[in-house]
Amino acid sequence: MPLELVTVPCLSDNYAFLVHDAGTGETSVVDVPEAGPILKALEERGWHLSQILLTHHHSDHVAGVEELRAATGARVAGAAADAHRLPPLDLELAEGDLVRVGASEGRVIEVPGHTVGHIAFHFPDSSLAFTGDSLMAMGCGRLFEGTAEAMWQSLRKLSALPPETMICSGHEYAASNARFAATLEPDSPMLIFRVGSIAAARKEGRPTVPSHLSDEIATNPFLRAGEASLKAAVGMVDAEDAEVFAEIRRRKDKF
């Protein structure tokens, strides 16, 4: 049975994600920007939280962990490589490790770039991937700690997941990301359509997260740095893919 997903808006533009196994009644949350909205969502559904999964150490993803742990008794799991700067962990995770939510099994994917210890969680039976600030709707996270080469390889790992995978990223950044993408390829029909769809969703107050991986592969410039058309668009026809990615990231940082 696929996991039930609840997207919980937090802070000004963050998301936390509740995942619930109806068969066993077990519930986990991915990232805790703040505890209040998550506790409210749990109470509204009568769910009990047993596990907190963390993608990376930034405060807007972990600030509510201690309050939520105290209120629910949930255990906390995060990257072993970042254990020294995450809230105290009950379970330290690395590439290929498995986490469970009820009967569902998720695999840990190390995705350095935004931070050096960033991880993602892929639940194949539910077609869900929780990517934090690595792969995002129409974008990717800034390179605060890692290199462009590291982030490019991380994005390649995520883009190799099944195309039907829903990408649950940590922020509502799609509108700005889409406007930036349109500056690179203003005449792309697929991009024009997606920019319009995102704008319409935001106008109606609907989240753009999660997004389909297939849509990201088709329109997200940070996944397309190896494509000839995008290399031509940025004037880097003969450059290595990671170099093109780095240039796109540099332009986005200044956008």
UniProtKB/Swiss-Prot annotation:
The UniProt record lists the keyword Nucleus: no
Biological process terms in GO annotation: methylglyoxal catabolic process to D-lactate via S-lactoyl-glutathione
Name of the molecule in the record: Hydroxyacylglutathione hydrolase
Catalyses which reaction(s): an S-(2-hydroxyacyl)glutathione + H2O = a 2-hydroxy carboxylate + glutathione + H(+)
Function: Thiolesterase that catalyzes the hydrolysis of S-D-lactoyl-glutathione to form glutathione and D-lactic acid.
GO MF, any single term: metal ion binding
Pathways involved: Secondary metabolite metabolism; methylglyoxal degradation; (R)-lactate from methylglyoxal: step 2/2
